[in-house]
Amino acid sequence: MEMDKRIYLELRNRTPSDVKELVLDNCRSIEGKIEGLTDEFEELEFLSTINVGLTSISNLPKLNKLKKLELSENRISGDLEVLAEKCPNLKHLNLSGNKIKDLSTIEPLKKLENLKSLDLFNCEVTNLNAYRENVFKLLPQVMYLDGYDRDNKEAPDSDVEGYVEDDDEEDEDEEEYDEYAQLVEDEEEEDEEEEGEEEDVSGEEEEDEEGYNDGEVDDEEDEEDAAEEEGSQKRKREPDDEGQEDD
């Protein structure tokens, strides 16, 4: 499904300003850019675009309230300065599985003063010498890199609470999405059943008309037979009458 169509479906008759979370994972980005997302989503706090074929985020709309952004498993190699401009309050950023090769690419993230957690799993930049040390030095506001702090201690539950809450809400969204999709499917099935019933009724009417016509034909044949029989009887009586007259 194309991204703009997926966004329309995810709205579920809501206005963009009513949406706080938007999951667009595994849909298609035709030109490698974010499509169908506008600055009307002013209340959006969580956006997930995992594996959608993004090569650029240059046309990301202004999302002042966005706190968590999932961009993993795409082909992004730059344009990260857009994030500081469009998402100034971003706290969690996942860029895992993208084409980020050097530290200069993530340097623009310095302007994200509230950035607390950054994930770069499976990016070439992680192969650089002293990768973790240099990233923490470059981005002093970041507390957790790939899930661990400067001392290689895993982020405690309190610091990943946002992730857990979001996952729960995502599950609820998926359930609502499934219910909505099922409702659409049920409506389509009902329409098909109604069409089938109309065809059956039409067929019965045709059969009734045929039966009625057959009945008319049978009645006509019976009348013809009766007329012939009556004529035959008259012919029999006529010779008898002639004989009586001769006598």
Curated annotation (Swiss-Prot):
Residues 165-247 are annotated as: Interaction with E4F1. LRR repeats lie at residues 18-41, 43-64, 65-87, 89-110. The modification Phosphoserine is found at S17, S158, S202. It comes from the Eukaryota. Widely distributed in the central nervous system, with an abundant expression in the cerebellum. Phosphorylated on serine residues, at least in part by casein kinase 2/CK2. Some glutamate residues are glycylated by TTLL8. This modification occurs exclusively on glutamate residues and results in a glycine chain on the gamma-carboxyl group. Residues 157-230 have a biased composition (Acidic residues). GO terms for molecular function: cell adhesion molecule binding; histone binding; integrin binding. Component of the SET complex, composed of at least ANP32A, APEX1, HMGB2, NME1, SET and TREX1. Directly interacts with SET. Interacts with ATXN1/SCA1. Interacts with MAP1B. Interacts with ELAVL1. Part of the INHAT (inhibitor of histone acetyltransferases) complex. Interacts with E4F1. Belongs to the ANP32 family. This is Acidic leucine-rich nuclear phosphoprotein 32 family member A. The lineage of its organism: Eukaryota, Metazoa, Chordata, Craniata, Vertebrata.
